[in-house]
Amino acid sequence: MLSRLFRMHGLFVASHPWEVIVGTVTLTICMMSMNMFTGNDKICGWNYECPKFEEDVLSSDIIILTITRCIAILYIYFQFQNLRQLGSKYILGIAGLFTIFSSFVFSTVVIHFLDKELTGLNEALPFFLLLIDLSRASALAKFALSSNSQDEVRENIARGMAILGPTFTLDALVECLVIGVGTMSGVRQLEIMCCFGCMSVLANYFVFMTFFPACVSLVLELSRESREGRPIWQLSHFARVLEEEENKPNPVTQRVKMIMSLGLVLVHAHSRWIADPSPQNSTADNSKVSLGLDENVSKRIEPSVSLWQFYLSKMISMDIEQVITLSLALLLAVKYIFFEQAETESTLSLKNPITSPVVTQKKVPDSCCRREPVVVRNNQKFCSVEEEAGMSQDRKVEVIKPLVAETDSPHRAAFVVGGSSFPDTSLVLETKEPEIELPKEPRPNEECLQILGNAEKGAKFLSDAEIIQLVNAKHIPAYKLETLMETHERGVSIRRQLLSKKLPEPSSLQYLPYRDYNYSLVLGACCENVIGYMPIPVGVVGPLCLDGKEFQVPMATTEGCLVASTNRGCRAICLGGGASSRVLADGMTRGPVVRLPRACDSAEVKAWLETPEGFAVIKEAFDSTSRFARLQKLHISMAGRNLYIRFQSRTGDAMGMNMISKGTEKALSKLHEYFPEMQILAVSGNYCTDKKPAAVNWIEGRGKTVVCEAVIPAKVVREVLKTTTEAMIDVNINKNLVGSAMAGSIGGYNAHAANYVTAIYIACGQDAAQNVGSSNCITLMEASGPPNEDLYISCTMPSIEIGTVGGGTNLLPQQACLQMLGVQGACKDSPGENARQLARIVCGTVMAGELSLMAALAAGHLVKSHMIHNRSKINLQDLEGACTKKAA
């Protein structure tokens, strides 16, 4: 329950960073300004003479205070030094923001408490720095930095708050209670220090729960690079911090802290309210005196300078202890900024040969890899295959990683391209770094697990054999290889090695590529247990003249003649003046099934849903789940006591299955409140209907309902399509209409609509399985024109399930195809327009393909063309199949 509250809080703060940051800063400034305008106007040294203040300055406490300041600075320095070892400049920057703003909030609180007296702030800041803990801030930053997208940043921050929030809250409570005991000691200096300590803990907690997560979310949102596959701040080796098992607090420790807190609360209650209430007032008075606020010993004087000049002079004039403190801070800052990075790299290079000078290579043919041009870096010469000095940052490069190589020279290391243990291309790199080879034999699992869990080392210090050994021992789940390796590609490579040993032919994966692919866009979105990617030829047809525009349409297919035939249809349409299209309806559907005790009860629910009041209730719940989803109508059917409710909603530019499922689930929960006896059997009851032939999609529509038409002049029919209008109409009636009816087809009143739909779907990142419903099409042909020699053709497709955001449309090759059509991503001006435009293009392309295919059938050219263009010229006798090999 507590974790859920912190998760909701974290999600809210991360989703509204500007509001939280502005609100937090405004609240802090208001507290300071309110104190300035309404508080006491006494300022020691400016308009008041404070003898007690002078006495404190001359006391021997200066030495202790100076030592405390130096220790605080050293403590902060070592914390940032540890953070640098993590290898992320974003963690350093975010931790710096946390420190600065926490100090600002703490200073504001102290100034407010001291009634504008800045001398006490000088004493309080060292105690604040000693109590600040950057480990929790960096832990939350790791959660965010391990994300692949901005939406995942918010989810991971919420998850981090759910894990870290309760622990941090309990720790802050315990610290305040423990430190607060010192405020009851009666020792003036101890009371002051403990008071400052409690303020420090509360200021840190306030910033961690409000400003910090909002700042992390905003910084990462502003620093993302949308053109890159993986965000520039994404750290794959931090993925394991997302494992709740590694972050869950020790329950024994938590119980001890709670018992301690309860005991300390009793101590405070007994001391302050039960034992003797008068000492409390006395202590408060003494504290006020100790802070230099006693009005009886202060004399009012006339200010000699303005207030800002007074503060400026105090800042410029420094005592010896301030000079010592400032000198130490500047010295450590210079060391950290200018020297620490070099020391860190030097230290890591002795531990890890991978961190020695890295050479990058652009992917080139194998023949080019034999050249050995020289690249000079850090006054050393290296062999590389890349000669272009001004290579753009946006171009794809691959890091060349060292592998263990047997060589006579201790200063030569073998490098290979890629993550496979069977390299295709190798280079030799001259280096002066001492060679530290990984052991040839795999180390014990315990040692490998320690290296894997070390933030400074990680998986890159383990060989592939050691990773495989950990997977076989169940220490690493095979499905998490990408997230645990230093690169996703290495995880895929290791999975291929694991799989190859289990296949009938170990070399089966030889021709399935896996390198140079952006797997960060695949994980968690498109595919699991990845072993590579499938290259499919992509052809282009066009121009497709549609609605006054010209489109070059990409089609991914392995069927010969398909692209050529569709291209001929596009040419015929363009010569006829182009095609026109309209979107008749736009609404994705989801059809859950619910059950009630009796059929009469189901009838009552159906009747209530069909009333305006019932629909309004369900629509309000449904629409609350998304800014795009808007419930349009409900189509309800009964089967006994089962009730099938078909929700239909617009989903913007997304195909919308996830969006509408979320809204459906919320609507069913609201419906359950009105009918508690209702049982929700499944959020999908096959009444949608998704990826199955269904008359409901053909009749009611699903996704986009599109119609497209064109008139082809008789001359074009004769010269381009090589047939006549009469012959095409005759074939269309007897094949597409009568023939499909004889076969009992549902939505299949076309020649080959599924061919064109599927080819475009694969090229543009759609769900290829949805070609089942999306290919519903009726192709009609009529004679047109004054002499009835022109051909009028139309295609009506009632259920094109398509989108331009989400799923496979996030992959870069698929995005390239969408960009060819000008519909990539979401339409900012009119949400949903890109998806509707893509649906019109699909329908227009289907019509072009239908036109050419029907012409080939009418002219008798189909078999001839396929025998020429759709048969492989490779001598099949030279290829050994699996069965042939076994038989031999």
UniProtKB/Swiss-Prot annotation:
Superkingdom field: Eukaryota
Q: In which pathway does it act?
A: Metabolic intermediate biosynthesis; (R)-mevalonate biosynthesis; (R)-mevalonate from acetyl-CoA: step 3/3
Q: Which GO terms describe its molecular function?
A: hydroxymethylglutaryl-CoA reductase (NADPH) activity; NADP binding
PTM field = Undergoes sterol-mediated ubiquitination and ER-associated degradation (ERAD). Accumulation of sterols in the endoplasmic reticulum (ER) membrane, triggers binding of the reductase to the ER membrane protein INSIG1 or INSIG2. The INSIG1 binding leads to the recruitment of the ubiquitin ligase, AMFR/gp78, RNF139 or RNF145, initiating ubiquitination of the reductase. The ubiquitinated reductase is then extracted from the ER membrane and delivered to cytosolic 26S proteosomes by a mechanism probably mediated by the ATPase Valosin-containing protein VCP/p97. N-glycosylated. Deglycosylated by NGLY1 on release from the endoplasmic reticulum (ER) in a sterol-mediated manner.
* Phosphoserine carried by residues: S872
EC no. given is 1.1.1.34
Tell me what reaction this enzyme catalyses: (R)-mevalonate + 2 NADP(+) + CoA = (3S)-3-hydroxy-3-methylglutaryl-CoA + 2 NADPH + 2 H(+)
Asked if the Swiss-Prot or TrEMBL record annotates the protein with the keyword Acetylation, the reply is: no
- What does the activity regulation annotation say? Regulated by a negative feedback mechanism through sterols and non-sterol metabolites derived from mevalonate. Phosphorylation at Ser-872 down-regulates the catalytic activity.
- Numbered residues of crosslink Glycyl lysine isopeptide (Lys-Gly) (interchain with G-Cter in ubiquitin): K89, K248
Please report the record's description of how this protein sits within the membrane: Multi-pass membrane protein
Extract the SUPFAM superfamilies matched here: Multidrug efflux transporter AcrB transmembrane domain (SSF82866), NAD-binding domain of HMG-CoA reductase (SSF55035), Substrate-binding domain of HMG-CoA reductase (SSF56542)
Going by the UniProt annotation, this protein carries glycans at: N281, N296
Write out the function statement from the record. Catalyzes the conversion of (3S)-hydroxy-3-methylglutaryl-CoA (HMG-CoA) to mevalonic acid, the rate-limiting step in the synthesis of cholesterol and other isoprenoids, thus plays a critical role in cellular cholesterol homeostasis.
Identify the NCBIfam families for this entry: 2A060605, HMG_CoA_R_NADP
Listed under subunit, the entry gives:
Homotetramer. Homodimer. Interacts (via its SSD) with INSIG1; the interaction, accelerated by sterols, leads to the recruitment of HMGCR to AMFR/gp78 for its ubiquitination by the sterol-mediated ERAD pathway. Interacts with UBIAD1.
Q: Under which name does UniProt file this protein?
A: 3-hydroxy-3-methylglutaryl-coenzyme A reductase
- Tell me what gene encodes this: HMGCR
